[in-house]
Amino acid sequence: MSDRTKGGLGQWFWVCWGVAMAWSLYRALFNEAWILDDEIAHYMISKDVWSDPRELWHPWSRPGRNILQFIPAYFGLTVARLWTLALAGFAMWLTGREGKRLGMVGLSILPLLMGFQWWFPELSYPVLTQTPFMVVWVGGVFLAMRKKMAWAALCWGYLPLVRHEGIALSALFGLWIIFAPGGFARHLLKGKWNEALKAFPRAAWLGFCTFLPLIVMNVASGLMRGEWPFMMFFESKPTEYYGSGPIWLYLKHLATGAGIPVVLLMIFGAFQKWRHLDWSLWLWATYPAYLIMHSLIYWKGLFASGGYYHFIMPMAPFVALVALRGFNGLWEKYGVKPAAAALAVVVVTGLMMPQQQWGVSDNHIPGLPVLNASLKPIAPPMKQSRFGQGVKEASEWVIKNAGGAEVLNHHAAASFWLYETGVKKLEAWGGYTPESPELCSGTLLIWDAHYSVQDDFGFTPERLEKVGWEVVENFAYKSVRIYRKK
């Protein structure tokens, strides 16, 4: 084992780590809202595992994410968020250790280049798939570089349990193994049949370790839920709802997600001279491959992608390492002042988080007047949007006025506000339509202009009025309503 894999990262690394993590911690503790509604749905499913163990293998909520988060979810949303943030901090440490193994200098600022990426503060702590995927991915690289191959294979095989596209990374890891020096496929290409035969047992063992998490998930899901998650990989277009987009969209997402300053440093770093190119470095190529894969998937409208920027946030460790190369190159060629200025811009814009201040709004909700956001020097904690506040107020109205009536809702936040209040809540995904006879007279509906009208539910105002639902109360410019069935 190389000496570069031993020893600590130095006190200044930990000072910068503390500064970077403090910014995310501040937002985790003081944000009153959430960056994505999906976080609340994931959290609720993780919490429900304790009353219904089958939910551990819930396909939409991703079993790999659930396994990592269902225990802290028992203690509440804040604890689950703090645990997830701790995983992000661990990923930052793993990235630093990899930087040391690679012989990089200036590692003390690596946490700043990672923690002040624009997407990091708002996606590092939520109960979502991003941080679990990030830590397992960089953990797989970390273990492989230290020759802990079976453990590395388990990490790479665990990725598709957290996010479906992880199966492509599992496959790339398999190719990296068999084409490595001394690998099974490399011997075959050279016509060295005896050597290939000798290398085969190792390749087979690591292949088994890579597939093991998928095998366990499918067996458990089959036994407990009667479902076989692996079949989703054979359904490339489960819905047309999410559409498609330009092939370059994820390049834009990388710039506005990680942040233009750090991406410019990364580009500069990518074009610095690479002195020691060996086979191990190719495992890091899975990161740009991941970006290319998402670009192609959304371009072709496959696998219900939606083209969302947060899908590529797990690239943060790679972005930070290559940006550090850029910082070092800037220092070597132009001196300390330009390098320090570049780092300052990364931190200042990381505190500003323009994509969060401009991009997170409810202007897309039908019926709401458009609000023009003003850019503040330091991004304030997130408040509930007008729409989100409307959902909260509607939920509070139901808690006070429902009596014994059954309540149906489609927004995950409403489920969150109604949780353990004694309200008789119906399952949103129970297959109900406005005409369902199971929805008896007096049933209440927390209707919202974003989710309720989607094809999966079909609760449009016109359809509701036609079959005898009446509006009882309005909230947030009528973008949220209480309906009662006559």
PLM regions with names:
Residues V346-A412:
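Membrane-embedded, lumen/periplasm-facing catalytic core of multi-pass transferases
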Residues Q130, L159-H164, A168, G257-I260, ...:
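Hydrophobic/aromatic-rich transmembrane helices and adjacent perimembrane loops
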Residues E122-Q130:
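Short acidic/glycine- and proline-prone juxtamembrane loop motifs at membrane-interface regions
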Residues W23-S24, A41, F179, K198-F268, ...:
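Membrane-lumen/periplasm interface segments of specific transmembrane helices
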Residues W14-M21, M114, L206-F208, W274-K300:
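Transmembrane alpha-helix segments characteristic
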Residues F90-W93, F184, T256-P288, V347:
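Hydrophobic, aromatic-rich transmembrane alpha-helices
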Residues V79-L102, V135, G139:
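Transmembrane-helix motifs of polytopic, lipid-linked glycan transferases
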Residues F13-G18, V105, L154, G207-L212, ...:
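Signature aromatic-anchored transmembrane alpha helix within multi-pass, membrane-resident enzymes
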